[in-house]
Amino acid sequence: MSRKLRYGLSAAVLALIAAGASAPEILDQFLDEKEGNHTTAYRDGAGIWTICRGATRVDGKPVIPGMKLSKEKCDRVNAIERDKALAWVEKNIKVPLTEPQKAGIASFCPYNIGPGKCFPSTFYRRINAGDRKGACEAIRWWIKDGGRDCRIRSNNCYGQVSRRDQESALACWGIDR
């Protein structure tokens, strides 16, 4: 079984990569699978009010309890958030990247942990120094949620471990060939 399949990338994500899809297409599919698309506000694992694919703000205003959006509005919000994440990658990652690599880094850094945690990270230092394998290893270290070790299944955050494996697989896509 290939390394990519072991890391649990879905058949849909693998098909997009095989077809030569763009980073926005790959990232959309990946985030739909990881975040879902909720048209009613909910609290995320950290207790923050979110909507759509994890947006915390809509039209410049914070998400509030009871907020509801149409699927079409969520699609627009999701596109804005996706494009911001990919623009962050283009601006801040100084090594050439493939489309799957852009999607993996966009999901991990700006989209999930946030730039404030990414900039001082070992991942960020390693990727920009050209140590791609080391950077991908460092993604997999981010497996705590609110201080809980997500490798312990009873902490109810094991999805974080799987997501980091998958983001690492995308961010390193093709470097082992």
Swiss-Prot record:
The keyword Hydrolase applies. Gene3D superfamilies: 1.10.530.40. Its EC number is 3.2.1.17. It is a single-pass type II membrane protein. Keywords: Antimicrobial, Bacteriolytic enzyme, Cytolysis, Glycosidase, Host cell inner membrane, Host cell lysis by virus, Host cell membrane, Host membrane, Hydrolase, Membrane, Signal-anchor, Transmembrane, Transmembrane helix, Viral release from host cell. GO terms for biological process: cell wall macromolecule catabolic process; defense response to bacterium; killing of cells of another organism; peptidoglycan catabolic process. It comes from the Viruses. The chain crosses the membrane at residues 1-23. The active site is at 35 (proton donor/acceptor), 44 (proton donor/acceptor). One of its GO terms (cellular component) is host cell plasma membrane. Disulfide bonds: none annotated. SUPFAM superfamilies: Lysozyme-like. The keyword Hydrolase applies. Its main location: host cell. Signal-arrest-release (SAR) endolysin with lysozyme activity that degrades host peptidoglycans and participates with the pinholin and spanin proteins in the sequential events which lead to programmed host cell lysis releasing the mature viral particles. Once the pinholin has permeabilized the host cell membrane, the SAR-endolysin is released into the periplasm where it breaks down the peptidoglycan layer. Belongs to the glycosyl hydrolase 24 family. This is SAR-endolysin.
